[in-house]
From Swiss-Prot:
Organism: Vibrio vulnificus (strain YJ016)
One Pfam family recorded for the sequence: TK
Gene this chain is encoded by: tdk
HAMAP family according to UniProt: Thymidine_kinase
Enzyme class: transferase
Name of the molecule in the record: Thymidine kinase
Amino acid sequence: MAQMYFYYSAMNAGKSTTLLQSSFNYQERGMTPVIFTAALDDRYGIGKVSSRIGLQAEAQLFKADTNLYQEIAALNEVEKRHCILVDECQFLSKEQVYQLTEVVDKLHIPVLCYGLRTDFLGELFEGSKYLLSWADKLVELKTICHCGRKANMVIRTDEHGNAIKEGDQVAIGGNDRYVSVCRQHYKEALGK
């Protein structure tokens, strides 16, 4: 029975690495997965999912207006798809998360989503909010703070390494802009 999974974490926990390993596992069994990633995240090239350890794969892009159910149904008509893998799923809209539930429930294809739970202000992303609500399985991937505790928050920094306390929810960046920390160090960095 197909299910929808949400693998979430702070940055640098290996979400993309885990996604790429899952894709490889399906391919190794002669099955056909399809990978999607957010069009707005082009840090490693357009239409690519890349991990910090050097793994990479081609991906279909989703934009704010992409109907994922229609896209996946069309791909599945051409060639049976055994799994849908979605990177940067925090950027999905409520409607797109619903469309992915339809992929699971009507097309009977498992959907594995990988993304951040919260932004640099500790607020849920829209996609993450509805994945937390509607996914069949929730899996937290763990990373560590500089103090050794579990990191579950993300700090956005300026060019001098100072924590930023306001701004747009989405600002694409990697280790140069974001630091994963525990809640205590998050509060200290923001002066809370």
